[in-house]
Structure formats: C-alpha cells, structure tokens
C-alpha cells in the first residue's frame, strides 16, 4: 500500500483516463473523500460509492474523447500532482494560477478544507496547491 494515497488516487484516475474507463476505485482517506466531492461538484463524475473503509468507487468519469472533435467544459484530459510530500507548494490567494485561461482548475488544501482555486480566490484564502486539471 502506498504511503501517499492522494498521489495513488490521481495515478489511478490518470490511468483510467488513458484507457477510457468510466469507473475507477481509489483508496479511501479523508483527503480522497473530499477530492471526490470536488469532482462531483465540478461535474467530472456522476456518482461515488464508498465500498468499504478502504476504497471509494468513482463512476461515470467524463473525459476527453480523442475520436470526436468535440470537447466540452466538463471533459478533462489530464490531472497533475503539484505539491508532493517531499516538496510542498504553498501559495497566497493572489498567486492562485488560472489553468488554460480559466477552463482548467486547481485544487487547494486550505484551512477551510479542500476547494477549487476559483472558490479560494473568492474567499481570498491561500493554501497548499495539490493538483491541477486541464481541459485542453
């Protein structure tokens, strides 16, 4: 079992995207649970189910389809981990990046919990920059 469950969840999500899987099972942790809530809020998945105290099942992943030329706002192409256990990345509210001219988003861990960069900018709070999602 890996020590960094969040990185493991992102890797499983990336691998599912590469093979166009609609369902992925990620390890359960409080961070991954909050992360799956954000994916639901951003309409990047349709349903999540807690399988046991160890796993969360994410269903109905929406991703970019290479065969069609259509890209919708809620289809994502790539997710990338920014802050790592060996190299934490903290930013102020004014330094929160815009990803793909506002089409992508970042996820921050703040004192108010996990939230997207847009929400953190609105509340004027910074935090640890966990990951980013690209749509282009």
UniProtKB/Swiss-Prot annotation:
Keywords: Plastid, Ribonucleoprotein, Ribosomal protein, RNA-binding, rRNA-binding. One of its GO terms (molecular function) is rRNA binding. One of its GO terms (cellular component) is ribonucleoprotein complex. It comes from the Eukaryota. Gene3D superfamilies: 3.30.1370.30, 3.30.1490.10. It holds the Pfam family Ribosomal_S8. InterPro entries: Ribosomal_uS8, Ribosomal_uS8_CS, Ribosomal_uS8_sf. One of its GO terms (biological process) is translation. Coiled coil: none annotated. The keyword Ribosomal protein applies. It is found in: Plastid. SUPFAM superfamilies: Ribosomal protein S8 (SSF56047). Its main location: plastid. Part of the 30S ribosomal subunit. One of the primary rRNA binding proteins, it binds directly to 16S rRNA central domain where it helps coordinate assembly of the platform of the 30S subunit. HAMAP family: Ribosomal_uS8_B (MF_01302_B). PANTHER family: 40S RIBOSOMAL PROTEIN S15A (PTHR11758). Belongs to the universal ribosomal protein uS8 family. This is Small ribosomal subunit protein uS8c. The lineage of its organism: Eukaryota, Viridiplantae, Chlorophyta, core chlorophytes, Trebouxiophyceae.
